[in-house]
Amino acid sequence: MAELTPEDIRSFSYLADIGGTEKAFSIPLIYHFLIRFLSPLVRFFFNINYSGLERIPRKGAMIVTSNHVSNLDPIFKILAVRRQVFYLAKEDHFKKQPNRFIMKSNGMIETLRSEGGRDALSRAHDVLSSGFALGIFPEGTRSRNKKPPFLQNGKTGVARLAASFPDIPIVPICIIGSREVMPPGANFIRFWKAIDIHIGVPVTFGEWLVSNDGGDFSK
């Protein structure tokens, strides 16, 4: 596999056209307590099965991606990663209390779609620059597709962030079963359902660029 030169990396970072706000990103204190409280609670109410946990980096910046079919998906991803994950979230989640308080106190990043989400991507840049884990759903919202594998077309945000940080690992996660627990439009949670969470092999944007199964820029 060919390797990218420093000049190549700078070129792709420039083309991604994402810059941070130059403000350091810190972990809200309440987030530490929430994860400790939430983990045993969720494990009590759901039968969660994990595979590939050893593939998740225990420290350093990374981008965590997955499919998105339920409002509970971010929680399941955080429990799988076993460290704080900061998400991009649509502005609707910030409009009313107590949702706004919960989102802000856990470092979630409000995405203003009227502005194309640029401010949110800049803060996401800050998360990665600070060495933290960024959670993002490539589809941009919960999928309403009713046919397996319940996917819809993705957005460009995750690709632009990955191009801005070609050496940061992207961890793919597949969540199976959360749609049965709380599908889009549902107001109630169905407890004691089985949730399967599969963690794939991490890959960096730089590795993808020169891979035969990716960008194949090595030729």
Task: Locate the predicted segments by residue.
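A conditional alpha-helix N-cap/helix-loop micro-motif detector
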Residues: 46, 114-118, 151-152
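A transmembrane-helix-recognition feature enriched in membrane-embedded lipid enzymes
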Residues: 2-55, 76, 83, 97-106
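Helix-adjacent hinge/juxtasegments
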Residues: 109-123, 128-129
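Hydrophobic/aromatic ligand-binding patch that stacks against planar heteroaromatic rings
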Residues: 77, 102, 126, 158-164
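Residue-level preference for the first positions of well-ordered beta-strands
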Residues: 61-63, 133-135, 169-171
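Catalytic core of membrane glycerolipid acyltransferases/transacylases, capturing the structured
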Residues: 58-116
